[in-house]
């Protein structure tokens, strides 16, 4: 049995954190002894780890400037301080500090892999968590395998940082059966009333998610008489700025930020449309989940969108990555009920491709090949 360590900054409410929990829970427990370790013991996704997955918590509180502080120390010193046990395979599951930390392991026979979840288009961005792009290139080349969550993520990364380490493309693991079952539960939520056209999006409230653009598109569509309500499921730093923007636009009664929900699927499955307004993505977990529950999708042309929705909009509508693109895509869907019905069928069809079994088996093949 191989001992595997997955190292990640925390298990907060983001997509990468959620799919790590899904993956750790579903790896073959007869083949792998799985440990998940965090740098900081925070995040709602901790509770979803199954009992057979060992969890090693980090510091109790996450503090500002921690990434800069870790750059002061060498990877070797950080590794010796943070990782106290011996493993057969070390996995950094998020680009950044954890990739630098695990690069400090030089033990004979230990294999290393690192995941890249988002587009990192410049050398500086590709070197996030490292002192310099030169250091990042040197340390990434100590890994046995890198993993990108989409082909476009791999291409952007290698353009920015020409590593020699092989890079596999492995899609995120989703609990498809669990998602489908949870989607059938009826939400009892006064913040989510029945009636009218309902549009949703699920994400951390942060600038890269583009909700400021979605708000402006929402206002324009309402002014044209295309009535609908938008529900944003998530929390984050942009909540107050978005609330202020909604009030300024006069749409605070139709643009609802309902916060974090343990079961977002019961909301997404009952919405007429899912919108990904992101400026930048990796391989959107939330869009994947929308497809699994059969909700039509409009997405900006960001990383992973074409792998999810098709090169020619076969399974969803991909639009220009701009406020105008979001507006035009939503307008097209809201103006054409037949098109919306078509993409509802196509979403359910596409969702079947991202089954838990297929994605887990692909990761296991990669681990076994190291």
Identify the role of each PLM range:
Residues 17-22, 197-220, 226, 237-243:
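A conserved mid-protein helix/loop that constitutes part of the nucleotide-sugar donor-binding site
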Residues 92-98, 116:
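Short His-centered aromatic/hydrophobic patch
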Residues 100-102, 141-168, 174-178:
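A short, active-site helix/loop in glycosyltransferases that binds the activated sugar's phosphate group
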Residues 260, 279:
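Aromatic "clamp/platform" in nucleotide-sugar-dependent glycosyltransferases that forms part
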Residues 6-14, 18-22, 26-69, 167-169:
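N-terminal strand-loop element at the rim of the active site
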Residues 243-259:
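Nucleotide-activated donor-binding/catalytic signature segment of Leloir-type glycosyltransferases, i.e.
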Residues 311-323, 332-337:
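Conserved acidic donor-binding segment of nucleotide-sugar-dependent glycosyltransferases
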């Amino acid at each position: 049995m191989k001992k595997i360590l997955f190292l990640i900054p925390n298990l907060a409410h983001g997509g990468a954190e959620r799919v790590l929990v899904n993956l750790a829970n579903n790896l073959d427990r007869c083949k792998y002894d799985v440990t998940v370790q965090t740098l900081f013991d925070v995040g709602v996704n901790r509770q979803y780890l199954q009992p057979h997955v060992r969890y090693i918590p980090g510091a109790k509180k996450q503090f500002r400037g921690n990434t800069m502080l870790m750059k002061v120390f060498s990877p070797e010193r950080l590794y010796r301080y943070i990782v106290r046990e011996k493993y057969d395979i070390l996995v950094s599951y998020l680009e950044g500090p954890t990739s630098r930390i695990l690069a400090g392991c030089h033990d004979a026979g230990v294999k290393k892999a690192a995941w890249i979840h988002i587009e990192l288009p410049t050398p500086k961005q590709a070197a996030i968590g490292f002192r310099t792009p030169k250091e990042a290139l040197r340390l990434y080349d100590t890994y046995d395998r890198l993993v990108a969550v989409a082909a476009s993520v791999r291409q952007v990364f290698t353009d920015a940082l020409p590593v020699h380490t092989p890079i596999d493309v492995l899609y995120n693991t989703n609990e498809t059966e669990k998602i489908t079952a949870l989607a059938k539960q009826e939400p009892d939520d006064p913040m989510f009333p029945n009636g009218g056209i309902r549009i949703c999006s699920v994400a951390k409230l942060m600038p890269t998610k583009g909700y400021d653009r979605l708000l402006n598109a929402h206002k324009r569509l309402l002014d044209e008489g295309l009535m609908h309500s938008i529900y944003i499921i998530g929390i984050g730093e942009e909540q107050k700025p978005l609330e202020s923007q909604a009030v300024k636009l006069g749409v605070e009664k139709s643009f609802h930020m309902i916060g974090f929900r343990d079961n977002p699927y019961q909301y997404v499955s009952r919405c007429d449309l899912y919108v990904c307004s992101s400026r930048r993505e990796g391989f959107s977990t939330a869009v994947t989940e929308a497809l699994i529950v059969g909700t039509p999708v409009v997405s900006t042309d960001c990383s992973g969108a074409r792998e999810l929705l098709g090169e020619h909009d076969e399974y969803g509508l991909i639009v220009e990555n701009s406020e105008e693109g979001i507006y035009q895509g939503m307008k097209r869907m809201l103006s054409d009920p037949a098109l919306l019905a078509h993409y509802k069928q196509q979403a359910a069809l596409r969702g079947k491709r991202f089954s838990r079994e297929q994605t887990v088996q692909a990761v296991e093949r990669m681990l076994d090949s190291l």
